[in-house]
């Protein structure tokens, strides 16, 4: 165990373990989808981002932050435009074999909250900062329980 550059404790827990728990569901919209339809999807599913896909490939990611930014800059008329005009095009992704600590560091340094999980050319999941925080809380709860048991038997 060691500390990463952002101060996160490095462990061997991988992205695969989170996906195995939360599932591999991937919500996406096509490039030509209207921003208003994507906003509706985010609201209905209570999620913060959706992948923008074309023929099975990631073309971008659309987050709540992207939407708020463009609404502030250009007003409500942007809701009639295609998501391709608003999405983030430079998508950072991870692999299932990446450690949770490594993706925490990626998210912190990159200042983003969602990370597509890609194996080869195939998208296999989407990890959010909420997923990571949930895992970290569970990890600490397990550690505390193990310490309590150790103290009882000492």
Segments from the language model and where they lie:
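Tandem CBS (Cystathionine beta-synthase) repeat/Bateman regulatory domains
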Residues: 1-154
């Amino acid at each position: 165990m060691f500390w990463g550059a952002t101060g996160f404790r490095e462990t061997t827990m991988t992205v695969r373990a989170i996906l195995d728990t939360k599932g591999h569901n991937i919500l996406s919209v096509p490039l030509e989808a209207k921003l208003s339809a994507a906003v509706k999807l985010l609201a209905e599913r209570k999620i913060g981002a959706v992948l923008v896909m074309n023929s099975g490939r990631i073309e971008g990611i659309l987050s709540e932050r992207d939407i708020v930014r463009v609404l502030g800059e250009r007003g409500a008329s942007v809701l009639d435009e295609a998501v391709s005009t608003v999405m983030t095009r430079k998508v950072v992704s991870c692999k299932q074999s990446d450690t949770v600590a490594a993706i925490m560091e990626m998210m912190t340094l990159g200042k983003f909250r969602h990370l597509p999980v890609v194996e080869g050319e195939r998208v296999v999941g989407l990890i959010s900062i909420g997923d990571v925080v949930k895992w970290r809380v569970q990890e600490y709860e397990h550690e505390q329980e193990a310490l309590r048991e150790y103290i009882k038997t000492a």
